[in-house]
Design a protein with these regions (language model features):
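Membrane-interface loop-to-helix entry segments
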Residues: 114-126, 191
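Non-cytosolic membrane-interface motifs at loop->transmembrane helix junctions
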Residues: 37-45, 74-76, 104-119, 142-146, ...
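N-terminal membrane topogenic signal
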Residues: 1-19
C-alpha cells in the first residue's frame, strides 16, 4: 500500500511539473508578441524559463524514482526548491506590490488572468508550490539551503540595477527605475525585496519539512 501511495505521489508530481513545461511554449510566444526581446529583462520571464527547465529534470527524475524506488537526488530537489522560490516571488510580488499599483483596481485581474501572465504569474507558481510542498518532501533539505534560494534574485537584481544605472534599460519594474526615485528609496526597495524573498524561501523550506541539521 505504501509503495502504491508513493507511486501515485510521484505521478502527481510528474503531472504538475510537466504542466509547467507544457505551459511555457504557450506563454512565451504571448510574451514575445508583447515585448519581443525586451521580455528577457523581466524576472517573471527568466524565472519561468528557468523553472520549466528544472521541472523537466524533476519529471524525469521522478519517473526514474518510480522504477528504482530511490528518492530524488538532493541537488535536484534543491534546484526545484530554488525554482519554486522564484515563482513564489513572482506570484506574491504581483499580489502584494504590482497588482495594487494599478489605479483602476483591475491590477490583480490583468496581471494574474490575462495573456501569458495567467501562466507565468498564477498557474505555474501554484503548480510549483503545490508539487514542492505536498508531493516532493524528500530528501529533506537542510536549513542552509534557504540562502541559495536568494541567488537568482540577487543575480537578476544586480544586473538589472546596473543596466538601469547605465541607462541601458528603464525598469522594467517601477521600483527598479533608479532615476525616478531617490537613492534611499532604491536601497529600501532592494532590502524589502530581499527580505520578502528570504521569508518566502524560509516558509517554503518549512512547509516542505526541511531539517535544521546540516547535510
Amino acid at each position: 500500500m505504501k509503495k502504491f501511495a508513493d507511486t501515485v505521489r510521484r505521478l502527481l508530481s510528474i503531472a504538475l511539473n510537466l504542466f509547467i513545461v507544457w505551459a511555457e511554449p504557450i506563454a512565451l510566444p504571448m510574451s514575445w508578441d508583447w515585448g519581443k526581446e525586451q521580455m528577457f529583462i523581466f524576472y517573471t520571464e527568466d524565472s519561468n524559463i528557468l523553472s520549466a527547465c528544472i521541472c523537466a529534470m524533476v519529471a524525469v527524475g521522478q519517473l526514474v524514482c518510480i522504477f528504482t524506488g530511490r528518492e530524488l537526488p538532493r541537488w535536484l530537489h534543491t534546484l526545484k526548491y530554488i525554482a519554486t522560490c522564484c515563482l513564489t516571488m513572482t506570484f506574491l510580488t504581483v499580489v502584494f506590490v504590482l497588482g495594487p499599483m494599478y489605479k483602476d483596481g483591475n491590477g490583480w485581474y490583468i496581471m494574474l488572468c490575462t495573456s501569458s501572465m495567467l501562466y507565468h504569474h498564477l498557474l505555474n507558481p501554484l503548480a510549483a508550490i503545490f508539487s514542492f510542498v505536498l508531493l516532493e518532501r524528500s530528501p529533506r533539505l537542510p536549513r542552509s539551503t534557504v540562502k541559495w534560494a536568494l541567488l537568482p534574485t540577487v543575480l537578476y537584481g544586480g544586473i538589472i540595477l546596473w543596466l538601469n544605472i547605465q541607462r541601458v534599460v528603464d525598469g522594467p519594474y517601477p521600483f527598479m527605475k533608479v532615476y525616478d526615485q531617490s537613492v534611499q528609496a532604491s536601497v529600501l526597495w532592494c532590502i524589502a525585496i530581499l527580505l520578502m524573498n528570504y521569508f518566502y524561501a524560509w516558509l517554503l523550506w518549512k512547509l516542505n519539512g526541511g531539517t535544521k541539521e546540516n547535510a
